[in-house]
UniProtKB/Swiss-Prot annotation:
Record-level GO BP terms: D-amino acid catabolic process
Disulphide bridges, residue numbers: none
GO CC, any one term: cytoplasm
Subunit structure: Homodimer.
Protein name per Swiss-Prot or TrEMBL: D-aminoacyl-tRNA deacylase
GO MF assignments: D-tyrosyl-tRNA(Tyr) deacylase activity; Gly-tRNA(Ala) deacylase activity; Ser(Gly)-tRNA(Ala) hydrolase activity; tRNA binding
Role description: An aminoacyl-tRNA editing enzyme that deacylates mischarged D-aminoacyl-tRNAs. Also deacylates mischarged glycyl-tRNA(Ala), protecting cells against glycine mischarging by AlaRS. Acts via tRNA-based rather than protein-based catalysis; rejects L-amino acids rather than detecting D-amino acids in the active site. By recycling D-aminoacyl-tRNA to D-amino acids and free tRNA molecules, this enzyme counteracts the toxicity associated with the formation of D-aminoacyl-tRNA entities in vivo and helps enforce protein L-homochirality.
Organism: Cutibacterium acnes (strain DSM 16379 / KPA171202)
Family membership: Belongs to the DTD family.
Enzyme Commission code(s) on record: 3.1.1.96
Record comment regarding domains: A Gly-cisPro motif from one monomer fits into the active site of the other monomer to allow specific chiral rejection of L-amino acids.
InterPro entries for this protein: Daa-tRNA_deacyls_DTD (IPR003732), DTD-like_sf (IPR023509)
Reactions that this protein is recorded to catalyse: glycyl-tRNA(Ala) + H2O = tRNA(Ala) + glycine + H(+); a D-aminoacyl-tRNA + H2O = a tRNA + a D-alpha-amino acid + H(+)
Location of the motif Gly-cisPro motif, important for rejection of L-amino acids: 133-134
Length: 145
């Protein structure tokens, strides 16, 4: 799995003109991508890492501050630009594989005590945020091996 975490003072996800998820207080926007080798265990470990990552004010974590998270699925995190000018998405897991893992990631965050807002899987989403810092972190679970 890959996540891009952005510290934000506010954020929202809009689908078909309707806000479906938002941060109204400072927190984290988490873009999540899934590949074919990811498992429920991967999702749980990544959720724990994100929840405990000390990147908020005064080197505190979202867990320390009970800061909200806005989780948005994003298969494009697995884009390959190795050949030509058109990205390939072949490393991204297909929807029937990735949607349950993104859901498991969100469910595990909630079980840890996180307030989690989400986008809508597979929808055309408009994501807006005010990046605080800016602070943007990339985590790829393949780097853990």
């Amino acid at each position: 799995m890959r996540v891009v975490i952005q510290r934000a003072t506010s954020a929202e996800v809009v689908v078909e003109g309707r806000t479906v998820g938002s941060l109204t207080t400072p927190g984290l926007v988490v873009l999540v991508g899934v590949t074919g080798t990811d498992t429920a265990t991967t999702a749980e470990k990544l959720a724990e890492k994100v929840w405990g990552l000390r990147i908020l004010s005064e080197e505190k974590s979202a867990s320390d501050l009970n800061a909200p998270l806005l989780v948005v699925s994003q298969f494009t995190l697995y884009a390959s630009t190795r050949k030509g000018r058109r990205p390939s998405w072949s490393a991204a897991a297909p929807g029937p594989v990735s949607e349950p893992l993104v859901d498991h990631f969100v469910t595990h965050l909630r079980s840890l005590g996180a307030h989690v807002e989400t986008g809508i899987f597979g929808a055309d989403m408009k994501v807006g945020l005010v990046n605080d810092g800016p602070m943007t972190i990339l985590i790829d679970t393949d780097d853990w091996h």
